[in-house]
């Protein structure tokens, strides 16, 4: 991995299964865990990663199954991590549509969320490797080249977001 690749790593922090305690956590502990995990991904110092209001809104909108005794299980933390990843790209309603089947599977005990999340994490590693390879070939020495790269990344981001939105629309029927 080159020095440039080292700069890209913080862009893709993920909450790893090993990072999640095997005990249920209170909301403040959940927030601390997410702040420690995703702090390196923030654009500016003091940027908010996760707040009580956000978590309460996710619960109110039923983005994850209900908590018991104000404690969040490992499955809740996995779902909140997925919400965190999705919220920068798609709307809350789209997140709900995306996670509905997952939540039902967890609630009905027909889905192993940890195995699903492990598979997701494997996909993120492959995605990062592809991204790093593409970025390594980009020449960003001249301002005009940087502008071209910025525009290209924004365009790719829009394409991926639109593709995700189409898939979400197909989930809705």
Name what the model sees in each region.
Residues 1-103:
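Basic helix-turn-helix/winged-helix DNA-binding cores
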Residues 98-101, 105-173:
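Intrinsically disordered, low-complexity, charge-dense segments enriched in Lys/Arg
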């Amino acid at each position: 991995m080159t020095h440039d690749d080292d700069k890209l790593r913080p862009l893709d922090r993920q909450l790893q299964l090993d990072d999640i305690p095997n005990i249920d956590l209170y909301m403040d502990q959940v927030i601390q865990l997410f702040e420690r995990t995703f702090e390196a991904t923030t654009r500016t110092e003091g940027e908010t990663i996760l707040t009580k209001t956000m978590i309460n809104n996710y619960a109110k909108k039923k983005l994850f199954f209900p908590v018991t005794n104000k404690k969040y299980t490992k499955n809740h933390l996995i779902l909140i991590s997925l919400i965190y990843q999705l919220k920068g790209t798609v709307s809350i309603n789209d997140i709900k549509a995306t996670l509905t089947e997952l939540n039902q599977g967890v609630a009905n005990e027909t889905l192993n969320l940890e195995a699903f999340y492990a598979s997701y994490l494997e996909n993120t590693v492959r995605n990062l490797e592809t991204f790093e390879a593409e970025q390594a070939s980009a020449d960003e020495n001249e301002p005009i080249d940087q502008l071209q790269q910025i525009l290209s990344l924004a365009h790719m981001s829009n394409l991926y977001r639109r593709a995700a939105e189409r898939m979400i629309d197909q989930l809705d029927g």
